[in-house]
Amino acid sequence: MHVRAESLEQCREFFCEAMLQDADRDLVQRLPHRPSLSKPSIRHAGWRCMIDCMPSAYDAAYQGTRGANSEDAAIDLLSNEAKLFPRDTLEDVFAAVAQGEARYGVVPIENTLAGSIHRCYDLLFEHDVKIVGETVRRIVFALIAPPDVALSAVRKALSHPVALAQCEQFFRKHPLIQAVPVYDTAGAVEHVIREGRGDSAAVATRRAAEVYGGVILAESIQDHSENYTRFLLVTPSKSPEAAKAPAEDYKTTIVFSVGNVPGALYQSLRPFAERRIDLAKIESRPLRGSPFEYLFYLDLIGCADAKPVSDALHELSVQAKSVRVLGSYPRHRG
């Protein structure tokens, strides 16, 4: 983010002052009258500054152990000073947020190679949370072993099944190395370093090697260099909203259901097409308790409170069986 230091400092002071005054709504009204804070990059910086200025009690839960990709995403979304708490499963992360044990949860929602994380979609629907941010991280895997272990001696490589699947070409080139699935990439590194076996390694990121003192035997072993994971920042639904950015810098995620009749999905999407609203992603998941009926998750560009998105959502609510806005949040710009 390339902004002048004085502009960023002005932005920080303005947003921190608003936080101290607990004046979120007033903040939204005042932003357009501050010309120096009108650019999207400054607005996004303001959102980050608000996070930085929150009391030190804020916590974030993520799935995995120290050195996991989700921990890196949490640092991106919050700050290096954030109090981060690892959880064993995605279910644990959502439960921690919903029950007030953590102010935020950081969860992966999709990967450019593996596709959508379906369980995360289900948990978004099942828990009373909302999305308030997103980030995208490039995923680069390495083969990591205890010190003094040679690549030629490795016979087992531990990692999350998705990570192993993204490194198939490496395992074809090294047929003596068996891929062993475990629950977490960084956790695999922690395990092999603790055990100290001369024939075991793990597939994870460079940062995991740094955290646990591992040695990198092979770098960039993923099949494709363009490997990215998108992460969401979730918080309890009743939490105050963060600072607003311009509508075009927002993404909105909704979930809706329709009747099983011809043209129902088409009619549901028509209000967005007629208003030229960009639909970034659509995902379907089974509606539990209703065999062969589905929930549709939709990512669209724009803010739910701003026209024309608000008009389209109103029209959708008339046609659909149910509609729920899961969150409007500053979208990742890369």
Where are these regions (language model features)?
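Domain-level signature for soluble enzymes in the chorismate/prephenate branch of the shikimate pathway
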Residues: 1-7, 11-15, 24-334
